[in-house]
Curated annotation (Swiss-Prot):
Listed name of the protein: Putative ESAT-6-like protein X
Residue ranges of the region described as Disordered: 72-95
Family assignment from sequence similarity: Belongs to the WXG100 family.
Stretches of the chain forming a coiled coil according to its record: none
Species lineage: Bacteria, Bacillati, Actinomycetota, Actinomycetes, Mycobacteriales
Organism: Mycobacterium leprae (strain TN)
Highest taxon, organism lineage: Bacteria
Length: 95
C-alpha cells in the first residue's frame, strides 16, 4: 500500500504568512495616517471633527481587518496541527 504524504508544514506556513501579513498592516496604516495628516486641510484642518472622525474610522477599519486576518491565520494553523495529529494517530493505528 502506498503512503499518503500531506504537507502539513506548508499549511502551517500559510497560516503564519497570513498572520505576518496582518501584522504588516500596521506599517501600511501608519503610512496612510501620515498622508492623511499631510492632507488635513481637505477635512477642515488637523484636529477638526471631520479629520478626527476620518482617522478614527480608518483606525477602526484597520483594526477589524487585522483581527480577522490574524484570527484566520490562527485557524489555519490550528487546522494544520489538528490534521497532522489525526494523521499521526490514524497512521500509528494502521501500523
Amino acid at each position: 500500500m502506498g503512503n499518503i504524504n500531506y504537507q502539513f508544514g506548508e499549511i502551517d506556513a500559510h497560516g503564519a504568512a497570513i498572520r505576518a501579513q496582518a501584522a504588516a498592516l500596521e506599517t501600511t496604516h501608519q503610512a496612510i495616517l501620515a498622508t492623511v495628516r499631510d492632507a488635513a486641510e481637505f477635512w477642515g484642518g488637523q484636529g477638526s471633527t471631520a479629520h478626527e472622525m476620518f482617522i478614527a474610522d480608518l483606525g477602526r477599519n484597520f483594526q477589524m481587518i487585522y483581527e480577522q486576518a490574524n484570527s484566520h491565520g490562527q485557524k489555519v494553523q490550528r487546522a494544520s496541527s489538528s490534521m497532522a495529529d489525526t494523521d499521526r494517530s490514524v497512521s500509528s493505528a494502521w501500523s
